[in-house]
Amino acid sequence: MTELLYQTDAYLREFDAIVTSVNDDENGILLDRTAFYPGGGGQPNDVGTFIIDGQEVTVTKVKRGNLHIIEGDLPVVGTQVKGVLDWDRRYKLMRTHTAMHILCGVVWRDYEASVTGGNMDILSGRMDFEFERMQKELVQEIEDKINIEVAAERDLNVAILPREEAFQIPDLIRTKINLL
């Protein structure tokens, strides 16, 4: 089981790990621990580099299950690697992710509209909401409310919960339940 370092420290930029498995078919490796986010929920995966035996190797993708797809030759099981995230990309994705949570929170709080879809990229994103009738005037109104929330500089709290427990918190789930 891979220790998911990004769950406890989203600001971690580098880490040391050991190769636990090699996937020849996808040119990927599994590690005992990782700070690379594999993507999910509309958020792209992290990319970056591994330093393996003094050589820099590009991490092009991280898949579910934390399979790190790399360029070049695969190391053997037991090899020590140093992971280095593309921090500029990660930080921009973090900011975008947070902004989308603020958008979702404002729309839920003030209009009781659930999220029906979405996607994000670096400093851009899209969220679909279940509005009975979306009016153009609402766009500026929502933006103004979001800016008030950003200006409030609220503390952000992260909690990793089992799925079943998260579903028991009514104000936490703002996505159409059939999409989860």
Question: Where are these predicted regions, by residue range?
Answer:
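A glycine- and charged-residue-rich anion-binding loop/surface
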Residues: M1-L180
